[in-house]
């Protein structure tokens, strides 16, 4: 929207990203991963149905995401569609989200290494957030300076989002979060709170939020929706 890009193109790209995001949550909740019973205040898919259904639903969402991006309705330029497909594949695959999930599953081995925890979360959570912003920049034909500013914004928002998630896991309530809390501590998994503590993590969230907003100065009032997104990330309780 900053670049007055076609709303239909943006929404189709956003839907593809959300399909990948939702597939990742379905698989993350499986017994072989985090083994969670609750998601968004409702039973997880494998609890509501069964593991096979959950696995296949996740697979279907993942493949549908790329089917949607490949459709000319997403963008008339085939090179743009290829750019979006490649970007989402990298963000969600072996050098992005999946790599982060592998590190998360080995959480006990990470221990108190802040650099390792940061890298894990930049991949597991941040990669998809980064691509969400990159996709808008691609479709909007942003300049190199604008792409750089947006990439830095997404980096900071992604880390802040995960830090808030870790704070909610440490001191949130199930009625607010819609999912189990205290999981990482119970399982001995490393996160920002287990490494830094709640207050130090909260301070870093504030620093990252302020920094993310500064990256948007280039866009002036056009960046209102992205500024609001920073506030949402910081203030969310779910």
Question: Which residues does each PLM region occupy?
Answer:
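Mg2+-dependent prenyl diphosphate-binding active-site environment of isoprenoid biosynthetic enzymes
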Residues: 1-164, 170-213, 221-234
């Amino acid at each position: 929207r900053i670049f007055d890009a076609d709303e239909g193109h943006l929404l189709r790209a956003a839907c593809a990203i959300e399909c990948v995001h939702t597939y990742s949550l379905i698989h993350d909740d499986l017994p072989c991963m985090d083994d969670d019973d609750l998601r968004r205040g409702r039973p997880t898919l494998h609890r509501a149905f069964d593991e096979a259904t959950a696995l296949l639903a996740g697979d279907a969402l993942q493949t549908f995401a790329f089917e949607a991006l490949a459709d000319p309705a997403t963008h008339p330029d085939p090179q743009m569609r290829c750019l979006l497909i490649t970007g989402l594949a990298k963000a969600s695959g072996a050098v992005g989200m999946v790599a982060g999930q592998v590190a998360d599953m080995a959480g006990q081995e990470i221990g108190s290494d802040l650099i390792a925890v940061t890298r894990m979360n930049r991949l597991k959570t941040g990669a998809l957030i980064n691509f969400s912003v990159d996709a808008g920049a691609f479709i909007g034909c942003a300049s190199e300076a604008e792409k750089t500013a947006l990439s830095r914004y997404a980096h900071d928002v992604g880390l802040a989002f995960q830090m808030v998630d870790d704070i909610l896991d440490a001191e949130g309530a199930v009625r607010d979060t819609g999912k189990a809390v205290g999981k990482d501590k119970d399982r001995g998994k490393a996160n920002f709170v287990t490494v830094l503590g709640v207050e130090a993590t909260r301070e870093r969230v504030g620093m990252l939020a302020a920094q993310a907003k500064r990256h948007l100065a280039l866009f002036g009032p056009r960046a209102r929706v992205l500024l609001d997104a920073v506030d949402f990330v910081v203030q969310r309780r779910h």
